[in-house]
Amino acid sequence: LAFLASGLPFGWKAWRKDHAVGLVTPFMLAARALALGAGYGVGMLRFLNLEPQERPVLKARQRLMKRLMDLAGALLSLIAAAPLSLAIALAIKLDSSGPVLYVQDRVGVNGRTFRMIKFRTMVPDADKQLGELIDLASLEEPVFKLKGDPRVTRVGGFLRRFSLDELPQLINVLAGDMSLVGPRPEETWLVRLYNDQQRRRLAVRPGMTGPMQVNGRGDLTFAQRLQLELDYIEHYALRRDLVILLKTIPVVLRGRGAY
């Protein structure tokens, strides 16, 4: 009735201007009122059935502080690691044919894909060989491990053991695709296998290091890793990032759990 009443002034003006138009105006107003009323009703039902929106994982201040730490840490690390990066690039070229860098699509915050950069640690056609080494269609979980992967080069094995292959990811951190600390960035085809709970780990930027890396690295099961990462997200604090960064140093130097 309210929608119908709101159209009465228009109907009166139409009648005064043209009686012929005025005769059909009530039917037009009735149709208008019905459409508006139906739309309002559906909208109210959808509103009432909506679950409360989740609060952002990180508050604005936390996001700002984390981003400032990422920018400062990545920039200083890139400068400090420049001589080592040049030596690694030379070693890769001398060890095997192919490019120095390996670029692959990974899934970032909120499911957005980005191009992750690493030093190449495998033979050039490693992606094509993967299907010959593991039946991807039969995976019970969205994760796989290949100990003693034959695709890894000699230099690549050394780089992986001490996570030196991940140094170029500092560029991803500067670009805003990654963070210094966060969940592990996963491949797109693995994320397609995620259920709703597993997708919760995409609520923040993936990290160069994270709770997985300082609590067992590749020796963890996917369930253990997921639990650690979700706990990190749900109880985020900047000091936890600092603690993880400090713990990463001895973990990397020991070289355990990296495949």
Model-identified regions with their sequence ranges:
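Low-complexity, charge- and small-residue-enriched intrinsically disordered regions
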Residues: 37-56, 248-259
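C-terminal terminal-structure detector
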Residues: 61, 147, 197-259
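Juxtamembrane loop-helix boundary motifs flanking transmembrane segments in multi-pass membrane proteins
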Residues: 18-22, 26, 56-64, 147, ...
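Hydrophobic alpha-helical segments of integral membrane proteins
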Residues: 26-30, 37, 41, 64, ...
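Short, glycine-rich, amphipathic interfacial segments at transmembrane boundaries or analogous
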Residues: 101-151, 209-228
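A short, structured surface patch at a secondary-structure boundary
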Residues: 139-205, 244-252
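Membrane-embedded multi-pass helical conduit in multi-pass membrane proteins
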Residues: 1-50
